[in-house]
Amino acid sequence: MRVSDFNFDLPDELIARYPKTDRVSCRLLQLNGENGEIFHRTFSDVLDLIDEGDLLIFNNTRVIPARMFGRKASGGKIEVLVERMLDEHRFLAHIRSSKSPKEGAELFLGEDKLGENNGIKAVMKARHGALFEVELSDKSTALLDVLQTIGHMPLPPYIDRPDEEADQECYQTVYSKVPGAVAAPTAGLHFDENLLEKLKAKGVNFEFVTLHVGAGTFQPVRVENIEDHVMHAEYVEVSQEVCNAIIATKKAGKRVIAVGTTSVRSIESAALSAEEFGNPDLIEPYFSDTSIFIYPGKKFRVVDCLITNFHLPESTLIMLVSAFAGYKNTMNAYKHAVKEKYRFFSYGDAMFINKNSNVRGLE
């Protein structure tokens, strides 16, 4: 399969640069992966699409204000995007500057907010491929506190605007809990407290996994043959409680519904790990990095339905959706979405997809 197989034309005006003021008011394209049928709805209609006893799996990661601006000791400007927090004072980051900082270089962060010569001092300790290991010099303040003071919300590049105060709330799910993501699990942005309460009242069950979304989620696939692509690694937690709920749901003949591709990748990583250790019919707790890459031809061991946003052309995420709903069904649904002027990407509209259990390759 070629990367170009997953391309589609998207007018720039369909890229959502601001969210809806009412989370549940976005549009919802319902896709039946078995037969390709499409229905146009509003997101609040998920209440009618999810049955009593079904299990919703959410990703409870919380986006950190991971983007910082500053300068090197030489005076050169830098932009720092935290990729992963290593401990209270060390982190891995992408650094943009005219010249990459060398090991031992001093960095002064947050001068855009704290004022010139008042930046928070840090040191570049080592380089790990494309990432830089950075350590705060002042050990009296934790990294999260520093980010809350000087950091900016790391809006995706396609939103193409500076972050605003409203993004601190809008680019965060209402159930986010565990800090560590540098991109939001955007399918969850459409749920508000009222909808969650209505789902609970209907008898829908909830469980939460944690996958800290990294900046690598926006990296393009740089090989022509998608089987040659190597996914970036992200940290995942799937608890015993989640596993028990999934097993009970399956035994009851109900559906496991993943909210977002990150929830899919978390659950399927845990199931794949169990299979590799000789338990093909089970899902087991998983606390580790995952670099699982799901594309047409890969099977889904757990997930029955998927709630997701509309993704970038040629991205690993549209490949995952194509594996779930079928390639032809997915590309046809995207064609319909463009024609009907759905809003795309992180702040855009959503899909509700039933799995195609018979799909193989580019079908």
From Swiss-Prot:
One of its GO terms (cellular component) is cytoplasm. Pathway: tRNA modification; tRNA-queuosine biosynthesis. Gene3D superfamilies: QueA-like. GO terms for molecular function: S-adenosylmethionine:tRNA ribosyltransferase-isomerase activity. It is found in: Cytoplasm. Its main location: cytoplasm. It comes from the Bacteria. It catalyses: 7-aminomethyl-7-carbaguanosine(34) in tRNA + S-adenosyl-L-methionine = epoxyqueuosine(34) in tRNA + adenine + L-methionine + 2 H(+). GO terms for biological process: queuosine biosynthetic process; tRNA wobble guanine modification. SUPFAM superfamilies: QueA-like. Keywords: Cytoplasm, Queuosine biosynthesis, S-adenosyl-L-methionine, Transferase. Its EC number is 2.4.99.17. The keyword Protein biosynthesis does not apply. Pfam families: Queuosine_synth. Monomer. HAMAP family: QueA. Transfers and isomerizes the ribose moiety from AdoMet to the 7-aminomethyl group of 7-deazaguanine (preQ1-tRNA) to give epoxyqueuosine (oQ-tRNA). Belongs to the QueA family. This is S-adenosylmethionine:tRNA ribosyltransferase-isomerase. It comes from Haemophilus influenzae (strain ATCC 51907 / DSM 11121 / KW20 / Rd). The gene is queA.
